[in-house]
Amino acid sequence: MKDQRLLDSVPLPNDPDRSLRPQVLDDFIGQEAARANLKIFIEAAKARQEALDHVLFVGPPGLGKTTLSQIMAKELGVNFRSTSGPVIAKSGDLAALLTNLEERDVLFIDEIHRLNPAIEEILYPAMEDYQLDLILGEGPAARSVKIDLAKFTLVAATTRLGLLTTPLRDRFGIPIRLNFYTIEELEYIVQRNARLFSVQISDDGAHEIARRARGTPRIAGRLLRRVCDFALVKRAKKIDRKVADEALSRLEVDHLGLDPLDRRYLLLIAETFLGGPVGIETIAAALSEPRDAIEDIIEPYLLQQGFIQRTARGRILREKAWNHLGLCAPASTISTQKCAQLLNTQDNSSGQTTLWDEADE
């Protein structure tokens, strides 16, 4: 996005919240199923004295994918190397990373769905056979070279599982989906961060921040910092519900965690397109925002909260969105939603889906 939003779940440069990240699995709050499974896999790998199988984290930004990757390396007692898909532009970039890894090291690739397809082809034998196949030279003088690699663990993160190719997905032995946090979990995180900041906060103050944090710890930490700024200037001795509510209201973050851009998104569909359906490209053009930003940052929370519905024909506002905006839904919109729900029910009646079956609509 062109302007940094307060409620962006992407990390900011020099973000002070980086220093608040937990260092061990037992200190990590939330994602209980993921933590429990990771603990078992890590203990098993250590007992066998082998590299942990490759891990793929799937979920919206800000839920702890990078933090969990760092914790995994520490729990395994190995080195941690980090990069991202768009940064690996040439085969030489990937070769330099892989050849510098030691036995059982963890290599973390964020946004792996943005990896160049040519680079992805080189990654396949590296993940499966721990070998690097490179072509040296050009034309008739070109020759293939195989380089043996240390047995490493690739930990990848993506917000868009549907953009990963099937061969790449199949090479990850441990797929883990991270979900939005509950308000109770976020309250605990806010209180913990406040203690680390040496700031006094009441239970209702922590609750007020947590319920507006969009289910995302990174956003909760950012909101806490801004509320601390207000409390300091207002000379409040303690952050209670009144202080938190006043600060967040002035920042235009409402009680459900929606900011002006979220409301623009909902109002656009409601007023311009009468509740939808409307295509994502049309929404992106009308909001002057990249499609990826809308799909990765704005829509996941709106979908999770039941404000919108994705259909084959486009996005549709649901009843909760109309109520939140204080608007009346057109009668045609209600019948369209019922039809879309019926179609979705029929589509899903054939069987259950797994993590690998999911794709972005």
UniProtKB/Swiss-Prot annotation:
Pfam families: AAA_lid_4, RuvB_C, RuvB_N. The keyword Ligase does not apply. ATP binds at residues 20-21, 62, 65-67, 128-130, 171, 181, 218. One of its GO terms (biological process) is DNA repair. CDD domains: AAA. Residues 182-252 are annotated as: Small ATPAse domain (RuvB-S). GO terms for cellular component: cytoplasm; Holliday junction resolvase complex. Its EC number is 3.6.4.-. One of its GO terms (molecular function) is four-way junction helicase activity. Residues 1-181 are annotated as: Large ATPase domain (RuvB-L). Mg(2+) binds at residue 66. DNA binds at residues 291, 310, 315. It catalyses: ATP + H2O = ADP + phosphate + H(+). Residues 255-361 are annotated as: Head domain (RuvB-H). It is found in: Cytoplasm. Keywords: ATP-binding, Cytoplasm, DNA damage, DNA recombination, DNA repair, DNA-binding, Hydrolase, Nucleotide-binding. HAMAP family: DNA_HJ_migration_RuvB. Homohexamer. Forms an RuvA(8)-RuvB(12)-Holliday junction (HJ) complex. HJ DNA is sandwiched between 2 RuvA tetramers; dsDNA enters through RuvA and exits via RuvB. An RuvB hexamer assembles on each DNA strand where it exits the tetramer. Each RuvB hexamer is contacted by two RuvA subunits (via domain III) on 2 adjacent RuvB subunits; this complex drives branch migration. In the full resolvosome a probable DNA-RuvA(4)-RuvB(12)-RuvC(2) complex forms which resolves the HJ. Has 3 domains, the large (RuvB-L) and small ATPase (RuvB-S) domains and the C-terminal head (RuvB-H) domain. The head domain binds DNA, while the ATPase domains jointly bind ATP, ADP or are empty depending on the state of the subunit in the translocation cycle. During a single DNA translocation step the structure of each domain remains the same, but their relative positions change. Belongs to the RuvB family. PANTHER family: HOLLIDAY JUNCTION BRANCH MIGRATION COMPLEX SUBUNIT RUVB (PTHR42848:SF1), PTHR42848. NCBIfam families: PRK00080.1, ruvB. The RuvA-RuvB-RuvC complex processes Holliday junction (HJ) DNA during genetic recombination and DNA repair, while the RuvA-RuvB complex plays an important role in the rescue of blocked DNA replication forks via replication fork reversal (RFR). RuvA specifically binds to HJ cruciform DNA, conferring on it an open structure. The RuvB hexamer acts as an ATP-dependent pump, pulling dsDNA into and through the RuvAB complex. RuvB forms 2 homohexamers on either side of HJ DNA bound by 1 or 2 RuvA tetramers; 4 subunits per hexamer contact DNA at a time. This is Holliday junction branch migration complex subunit RuvB. It comes from Bartonella quintana (strain Toulouse). The gene is ruvB.
